[in-house]
């Protein structure tokens, strides 16, 4: 399909595709909503409170998420902001969903890290940063909850640098906190932005003044606190000179902003920083070659499958990241893994569960393809070229359960449900070779609850999960057929096939795994598998 290269370059330059990473309860869902407010994508903010509130957050749209007030599914939201097009991928904040979150991070060009100002760097943030590290993802940081008592800002920066091994360069610096939160001083603009309570749900532009030394600020903070602010400001002003865009783009340095997502203060500064510094869509690796965003032929990969986004539709949607070229309604694409040509007449764009039919999409955009069971995570779509995008792995689960069906007559529905949920990446299924058991693997306990809930709600299947003595799993690979056959004979009782039919070893203990690895050096025991 002919694409005007000039128009394509312009559209690519406008795009910013990012995800928010944080520990649960650092304010990620609130931040998502406020970003949508600034992007004029929503008019009313539905703050997530308890399970009794009617107005749930726009980005939490599966019934279980709304009941529990946590984001389980990755949703996708697109909105315009100052001549740019922003694609925001909301990631599950709950500790159990690292696999889904990881796959989402393969589809973004930068990330916004949120830190709770009272708690500092938390465990989940550390894990997510490790994933960003693997991909050298540029990070913008936002220290949240300045309208409450937080830790000393300099102490927070030191902790981020020490724990996450990333250099911090403040863009804004807080003046006071909690009851005495005056606002922030913007270091590059030499302006103070004043915080006013009560504007959490609207887009009131903060009052600004040049500099920061004003009698009313001194009076509000008191002499001691103002002196402390000036002292810390001097230190961070020296750091600002070290800001290096290349180091930021390599994921080694992060611009830091302060504010309150709940109070909608500092959110537009995050968007401004994103547009100023974050990269437009980057090149993506494939097994065959690197694909640049500005290439005129279409290509993209599926990083997520979501079943039953709308119970009324009973469907499954494959989320595809556009890597190059332009999607146009009705275009013919090659589904590379199957070697089949398909006509895509009804791709979707999203505002968290609200679907709209899509006429066109550019690199960096996320589109939804209707999936009737033929699309898997990691699949590539092109205009004909044989390209297989890389870097979308399965991780070895750390928890295992045996599935026990309450009604044996429902076994067909159970298998269908588990197959679909595993294709979607909600769980991994293993079938031991010595019996007819179905073993589920997950990264965290909550995943089992989600699977049980969804099997019951969507497939009308009730099961119980019981513990099973499996410590970990490894994918098996061996080029030497004789050695592989010998290994299979010896390890028969521990072997299984995963949902994709790949041979796996279910280790009863870490010690056992180590013994098998020592005994069979020609066999590769891998803890990840590419989709």
From Swiss-Prot:
Binding sites annotated in the UniProt record for GTP: 22-29, 90-94, 144-147
Ranges for domain tr-type G: 13-282
PROSITE patterns in the record: G_TR_1, G_TR_2
UniProt xrefs under Gene3D superfamilies: P-loop containing nucleotide triphosphate hydrolases (3.40.50.300), Peptide chain release factor 3, domain III (3.30.70.3280)
GO BP term (any one): regulation of translational termination
The entry's keywords: Cytoplasm, GTP-binding, Nucleotide-binding, Protein biosynthesis
Location of this chain's protein in the cell: Cytoplasm
Single GO molecular function: GTP binding
UniProt-listed Pfam families: EF-G_D2, GTP_EFTU, RF3_C
An example Gene Ontology CC term for this record: cytosol
Homology family: Belongs to the TRAFAC class translation factor GTPase superfamily. Classic translation factor GTPase family. PrfC subfamily.
Function: Increases the formation of ribosomal termination complexes and stimulates activities of RF-1 and RF-2. It binds guanine nucleotides and has strong preference for UGA stop codons. It may interact directly with the ribosome. The stimulation of RF-1 and RF-2 is significantly reduced by GTP and GDP, but not by GMP.
Name by which UniProt lists this protein: Peptide chain release factor 3
Organism of derivation: Psychrobacter cryohalolentis (strain ATCC BAA-1226 / DSM 17306 / VKM B-2378 / K5)
């Amino acid at each position: 399909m002919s694409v005007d290269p000039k128009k394509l370059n312009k559209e690519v330059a406008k795009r910013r595709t990012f995800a928010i990473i944080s520990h649960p309860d650092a304010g990620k869902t609130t931040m998502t909503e406020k970003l949508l407010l600034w992007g004029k994508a929503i008019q009313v903010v539905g703050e997530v409170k308890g399970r009794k509130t009617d107005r749930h957050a726009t980005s939490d749209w599966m019934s279980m998420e709304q009941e529990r007030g946590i984001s389980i599914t990755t949703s996708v939201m697109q909105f315009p902001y100052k001549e740019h097009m922003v694609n925001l991928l909301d990631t599950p904040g709950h500790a159990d969903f690292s696999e889904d979150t990881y796959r989402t991070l393969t589809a973004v060009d930068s990330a916004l890290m949120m830190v709770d100002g009272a708690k500092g760097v938390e465990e989940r943030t550390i894990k997510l940063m490790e994933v960003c590290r693997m991909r050298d993802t540029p990070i913008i940081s936002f220290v949240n909850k300045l309208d409450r008592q937080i830790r000393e800002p300099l102490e927070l920066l030191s902790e981020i640098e020490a724990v996450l091994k990333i250099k911090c360069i403040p863009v804004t610096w807080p003046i006071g906190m909690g009851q005495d939160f005056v606002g922030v001083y913007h270091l590059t603009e030499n302006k103070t932005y004043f915080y006013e309570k009560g504007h959490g749900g609207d887009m009131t532009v903060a009052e600004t003044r040049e500099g920061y030394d004003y009698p009313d600020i001194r009076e509000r903070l008191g002499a001691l606190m103002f002196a402390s602010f000036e002292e810390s400001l001097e230190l961070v002003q020296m750091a600002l000179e070290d800001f290096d865009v290349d180091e930021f783009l390599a994921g080694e340095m992060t611009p830091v902003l302060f504010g309150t997502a709940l109070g909608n203060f500092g959110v537009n500064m995050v968007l401004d920083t994103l547009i100023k510094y974050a990269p437009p869509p980057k090149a993506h690796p494939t097994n065959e070659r690197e694909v640049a965003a500005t290439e005129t032929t279409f290509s993209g990969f599926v990083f997520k499958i979501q079943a039953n986004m709308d119970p009324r539709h009973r469907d499954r949607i494959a989320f595809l990241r556009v890597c190059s070229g332009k999607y146009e309604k009705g275009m013919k694409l090659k589904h590379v893994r199957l070697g089949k040509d398909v006509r895509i007449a009804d791709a979707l764009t999203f505002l968290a569960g609200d679907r709209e039919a899509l006429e066109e999409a550019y690199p960096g955009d996320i589109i939804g393809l209707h999936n009737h069971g033929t699309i898997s995570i990691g699949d590539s779509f092109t205009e004909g070229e044989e390209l297989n995008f890389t870097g979308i792995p399965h991780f070895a689960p750390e928890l295992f359960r045996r599935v026990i069906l309450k009604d044996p007559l429902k076994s067909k529905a159970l298998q269908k449900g588990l197959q679909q949920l595993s294709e979607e990446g909600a769980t991994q299924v293993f079938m031991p070779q010595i019996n007819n058991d179905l073993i589920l693997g997950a990264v965290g306990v909550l995943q089992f609850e989600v699977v049980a809930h969804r099997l019951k709600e969507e497939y009308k299947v009730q099961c119980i999960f019981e513990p099973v003595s499996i410590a970990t799993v490894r994918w098996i690979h061996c080029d030497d057929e004789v050695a592989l056959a010998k290994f299979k004979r010896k390890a028969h009782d521990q072997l299984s096939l995963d949902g994709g039919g790949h041979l796996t070893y279910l280790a009863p203990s870490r010690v056992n795994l180590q013994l098998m690895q020592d005994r069979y050096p020609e066999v590769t025991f891998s803890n990840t598998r590419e989709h």
